[in-house]
UniProtKB/Swiss-Prot annotation:
PANTHER family: SPERM EQUATORIAL SEGMENT PROTEIN 1
Record's keyword terms, sorted: Cytoplasmic vesicle, Developmental protein, Glycoprotein, Signal
GO biological process terms, semicolon-separated: acrosome reaction; fertilization; fusion of sperm to egg plasma membrane involved in single fertilization; sperm-egg recognition
Name under which the protein is recorded: Sperm equatorial segment protein 1
Residue ranges with Polar residues bias: 165-189
The record's account of how the chain is modified after translation: Glycosylated. In testis there are two predominant forms of 77- and 67-kDa and a form of 47-kDa, whereas in epididymal sperm from caput, corpus, and cauda there are two forms of 47- and 43-kDa. Testis forms contain complex carbohydrate residues. Epididymal sperm forms are N-glycosylated. Then undergoes significant glycosylation in the testis and that the majority of these glycoconjugates are removed by the time sperm reach the caput epididymis.
The gene coding this protein: SPESP1
One of the record's GO cellular component terms: acrosomal vesicle
Glycosylation sites: N129
Family: Belongs to the SPESP1 family.
Chain segments carrying region Disordered: 139-204
Signal peptide: 1-18
Compositional bias of kind Acidic residues: 144-157
Organism: Bos taurus (Bovine)
Any matching Pfam family: SPESP1
Length: 366
C-alpha cells in the first residue's frame, strides 16, 4: 500500500510544474528524487508481465542483478546513447545551464570535477516492452509491441556490447545515491536480442577448405567406383580358358611360318647373288667367270626356254636378242669348216654304202 501511495504521489508531482519549463533542483532535492526513482523502479519491476514465456517475477534491486558503482545522478555526467524500444537501461540526459543538444547516435562520457551546474534530469525506464517515461508535463505508461532492432552499424570507437551479464556505469568521485542499469538478465525474464556477430575471414577459408575436401573425396569415390566396375567387366573371347590351347597352337604355327619365310628369303637372296653379275665390276675377273658358269649351270635345263625369243617378255626381248647372237657368234666361230667337212665325209660314206648294196643285189639276181 505504501508503494502505491508513493507511486501516485510521484506521478502527480511533476504535473504541478508549468509545461515546457526547465526546473532547477538543489542537491538535496536531487537526492530525494533519485530515491523516488529507485523506489519507482523497484515497483515497476515487481509487476509481472502477461507475455508468454515471461511469467517469472523480478527480484529486488538489492540482489546480484543490480550490482553497480555508487555514482551521482547529475554530477557533470553526460550520456548520449542511441536507445531502441527494447533497451533495458536507465538513460540519464542532464540538461545544464548551457544549451545541450541530444544526438541520436554515439556514446560520449565527459567528467568535470571542478564545475557544478544546476540541471534538470530526464529518465526513461524501459524494461522489456513496458516503457515508463517521466516528463515535466505529464507522466504516462505506454505499452509498445516489440519491434525488430536494426542491425548495428560498425563504429570507429569501441562500444561495449550488451550481453546477459549486468553492465556497470562508471563512477564519479563524489558518492551519492545508487544509479543502476537494468540489465536484461534471466531473473527478469527478458530475452535479450541476439547481436549480429561479424564473420571472420577465417570462416570463409574454412568453408573453402571443407568444400575442397568434399570435392576431393567425391573424385576419389568416383575413381574407386570405376576401378570396381573394371574388375567386374566380363573377359573377352581371347581370355576364356577353352580358347587358350588354340591360341597357343596358333602362336606356335605363326612362329614357325615366320622362321620358314625368313629362311626362304635368305636362300633366294643368296641364289640371286650367285646367279647375277655384281654391278660395277669388270667382266674379266675370275669372279665373273665363276658367276656366269654357275648361273648357266643352274639354269641348264631351261636354257632353251630362256634363249627362245617367244618366251622372253617384250621389254626384255632386245637384250635377249643381243645375248643370243653373241652366244651364236661365240659358239659357232672356227667350227664351221670342220662341220662342213664332217658332213661331206658322212655323205660320201653314205653314197659308198649305197653303191655296195646296189652291186650286191645285182650279183644275187644274176
Amino acid at each position: 500500500m505504501k508503494f502505491l501511495v508513493l507511486l501516485v504521489a510521484l506521478l502527480l508531482w511533476p504535473s504541478s510544474l508549468p509545461a515546457y519549463r526547465r526546473v532547477t533542483v538543489t542537491p538535496d532535492e536531487e537526492q530525494n528524487l533519485n530515491h523516488y526513482v529507485q523506489v519507482l523502479q523497484n515497483l515497476i519491476l515487481s509487476v509481472p508481465t502477461k507475455e508468454p514465456g515471461r511469467q517469472k517475477k523480478s527480484k529486488s534491486p538489492n540482489n546480484a542483478n543490480f550490482i553497480g558503482p555508487r555514482v551521482s545522478r547529475v554530477k557533470e555526467l553526460k550520456y548520449t546513447h542511441d536507445v531502441g524500444p527494447g533497451d533495458n537501461d536507465v538513460l540519464i540526459n542532464p540538461v545544464s545551464e548551457e544549451t545541450t543538444t541530444f544526438p541520436t547516435r554515439g556514446f560520449t562520457l565527459e567528467i568535470d570535477k571542478k564545475k557544478r551546474t544546476k540541471s534538470t534530469a530526464f529518465w526513461s525506464i524501459k524494461p522489456s516492452n513496458v516503457s515508463v517515461v517521466l516528463h515535466a508535463k505529464e507522466p504516462f505508461i505506454e505499452k509498445d509491441e516489440p519491434e525488430p532492432e536494426p542491425e548495428p552499424e560498425p563504429e570507429p570507437e569501441p562500444v561495449e556490447h550488451r550481453t546477459g551479464a549486468p553492465t556497470q556505469v562508471p563512477s564519479v568521485t563524489e558518492p551519492s545515491q545508487d544509479v543502476t542499469s537494468l540489465s536484461g538478465s534471466t531473473d527478469l525474464g527478458t530475452a535479450t536480442e541476439e547481436e549480429d556477430v561479424p564473420q571472420l575471414s577465417g570462416d570463409n577459408e574454412m568453408d573453402y577448405l571443407e568444400s575442397h575436401d568434399m570435392y576431393n573425396e567425391d573424385v576419389l569415390k568416383r575413381i574407386a567406383d570405376i576401378n570396381s566396375q573394371l574388375h567386374h567387366v566380363p573377359l573377352p573371347e581371347s581370355y576364356k580358358p577353352e580358347y587358350r590351347a588354340d591360341i597357343r597352337a596358333s602362336k606356335e604355327h605363326l612362329k614357325r611360318s615366320l622362321a620358314l619365310a625368313i629362311a626362304a628369303e635368305h636362300k633366294l637372296e643368296k641364289m640371286y647373288k650367285s646367279q647375277m653379275l655384281p654391278q660395277g665390276r669388270s667382266s674379266g675377273g675370275v669372279y665373273d667367270i665363276i658367276t656366269v658358269i654357275n648361273m648357266l649351270y643352274n639354269s641348264r635345263y631351261k636354257l632353251s626356254e630362256y634363249l627362245d625369243i617367244k618366251y622372253v617378255p617384250l621389254e626384255m626381248r632386245g637384250k635377249a636378242t643381243v645375248v643370243v647372237h653373241t652366244l651364236k657368234r661365240i659358239l659357232c666361230v672356227g667350227h664351221g669348216e670342220e662341220t662342213h667337212n664332217l658332213l661331206k665325209q658322212l655323205l660320201n660314206n653314205n653314197i659308198r654304202i649305197l653303191h655296195i648294196l646296189d652291186t650286191h643285189d645285182k650279183d644275187d639276181s644274176s
